[in-house]
Amino acid sequence: MSGIIGKNIGMTSMYDESGFNVPCSIIEAGPCIVLQIKTKEKDGYDSCQLGFDEKKYKNTNKPLLFFFKKFKSTPKKKIFELPIKGNIKSGNIIKLNCFHENELVNITGFSKGKGFQGVVKRHGFSGVGERSHGQHNRSRAPGSIGAGSDPSRVFKGTRMAGRMGNKKVTLKNRKILKIDLLNNFLIIKGSVPGAKNSYLIIKKLK
């Protein structure tokens, strides 16, 4: 299998073989059930849908209940689509035994949302002018956003204040330090995108 779905549990630290204290992230990954298999003949490409994290029946709408019933699965909170690697069939259970320690993986998730932020925090602007000689309220200002009557518009891509964070982020070549098959935990070196309990996709390198 090319990857697995996980949930960000939090961060801790552990000592490596050299005695260095290494920060690491704990991810609860799997077990995931294989739902729909998409083929090139029928859908135009090859992939499979994985379901992860149990969901209550009362919180699931009828179309989704019929969808999960079709593939003989209980309702799941998250469904992600991943490329197929190997002989995968609908109903198979994907666990962490497809990974091994010291393997490098790519981790995809959504970064923490920061809300509406100004240009100093969002883009690293320095503000306008010096903080002296009577200036007051310009220390975090964006400054000019363009010329006047020519071109009579603001160019696309001009860096301005706006919503920050909550973007799709992929961290590449993250090392697996330890695998806990009993509790379905992956210990990854360093940090991962998103807040606690946010969902992640852990992919093998191609």
UniProtKB/Swiss-Prot annotation:
<keyword id="KW-0694">RNA-binding</keyword>
<comment type="subunit">
    <text>Part of the 50S ribosomal subunit. Forms a cluster with proteins L14 and L19.</text>
</comment>
<dbReference type="GO" id="GO:0022625">
    <property type="term" value="C:cytosolic large ribosomal subunit"/>
</dbReference>
<keyword id="KW-0699">rRNA-binding</keyword>
<comment type="similarity">
    <text>Belongs to the universal ribosomal protein uL3 family.</text>
</comment>
<dbReference type="GO" id="GO:0006412">
    <property type="term" value="P:translation"/>
</dbReference>
<dbReference type="InterPro" id="IPR009000">
    <property type="entry name" value="Transl_B-barrel_sf"/>
</dbReference>
<keyword id="KW-0689">Ribosomal protein</keyword>
<dbReference type="InterPro" id="IPR019927">
    <property type="entry name" value="Ribosomal_uL3_bac/org-type"/>
</dbReference>
<keyword id="KW-0687">Ribonucleoprotein</keyword>
<dbReference type="GO" id="GO:0019843">
    <property type="term" value="F:rRNA binding"/>
</dbReference>
<comment type="function">
    <text>One of the primary rRNA binding proteins, it binds directly near the 3'-end of the 23S rRNA, where it nucleates assembly of the 50S subunit.</text>
</comment>
<dbReference type="Pfam" id="PF00297">
    <property type="entry name" value="Ribosomal_L3"/>
</dbReference>
<feature type="region of interest" description="Disordered">
    <location>
        <begin position="127"/>
        <end position="149"/>
    </location>
</feature>
<dbReference type="GO" id="GO:0003735">
    <property type="term" value="F:structural constituent of ribosome"/>
</dbReference>
<dbReference type="InterPro" id="IPR000597">
    <property type="entry name" value="Ribosomal_uL3"/>
</dbReference>
<dbReference type="InterPro" id="IPR019926">
    <property type="entry name" value="Ribosomal_uL3_CS"/>
</dbReference>
<protein>
    <recommendedName>
        <fullName>Large ribosomal subunit protein uL3</fullName>
    </recommendedName>
</protein>
